[in-house]
Amino acid sequence: MKTYDRNRNAIATGSMVMIAGNGTTGVIKAIHGEGKTAEQLRRADCVEIDGCEGRFCPLDLVRLGFH
C-alpha cells in the first residue's frame, strides 16, 4: 500500500521516515488502509513504524529514503 507524507512524497512499506513531531526515525512496517479512500488514508493514524509504539498519520511523517 502507498500513501503520501506531509511533503507529498510517496511512502510505502520499507520507506525510511522521520516523525515530524519528535524527530524519531524508523522504517515503515505496515500501512493499515483497508476500506479507506486515499484522502482518508492520508489523514488517519494508520502507519506502523519499526521501533515506535502506536500508529502514525502520514501527514506527521517526512520521507528520508524510499527502499
What is each of the regions a protein language model found here?
Residues 16-59:
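Basic/aromatic-rich interaction segments and small domains that mediate binding to polyanionic partners
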Residues 63-67:
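Short hydrophobic/aromatic patches at helix-to-coil boundaries
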Residues 1-13:
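Mixed-charge, Lys/Arg-rich low-complexity intrinsically disordered regions
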